[in-house]
Amino acid sequence: QEAQDAYDRHQRDLDRFNRSIWERPGEQVALEWVSEWVGNRAREGYRVIVVDPITVCRPSAQPWIDDHKFVTSAEHALSTCNASLLLVTHSAKNRHEIDMDSIAGGHAYQKLSQSILLLERHKPPKEVTMVKPGIDMGRFQCEINETIHICKARKGKGQGMSIGFIIDWKNLDFAEQGVILKKGQ
């Protein structure tokens, strides 16, 4: 019932947002198609463009070249139209480390991105030591079920930090808990 109430409160905004969602064609598409689609949305005036997931694109014979072409082509379209692109990807297979190499896709995404955020789910919830920057609370223990790792922050602070969250998917609610301290801090 709480989720329905939240939907009712935000229905107008959600309906407006829904008109800005496209589905890919039924078949897998090439990165060139996605690049053209991103450019078209940017020229139409969309400020934030999201591709979720970029890893669903048709595999190519030369992914390192095609990834680089895609990123540079998208970057050109976005910069001329003052738009931003969010690419959603997944963890690379058989990788358990939390770093830029743990994301699926080529190095072009790592090298040419402004920011890389990695979402880590904790099932069961994880106990961590945290601080809240700017609030004199000191260290505290907290149980979280999601972590956002800031793997790259080219034009901002926070690279290498991790932020703990409690997300209640049933009620579509979340609460930031603070910055997770690394062991030994």
Give residue ranges: language-model regions.
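Conserved helix-turn-beta segment of the N-terminal RecA-like "Helicase ATP-binding" lobe
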Residues: 1
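Conserved P-loop NTPase "ATPase switch" module shared by AAA+ and STAND
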Residues: 44-60
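Structural recognition of the conserved hydrophobic beta-strand(s) that form the central parallel beta-sheet
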Residues: 50-52, 83-90
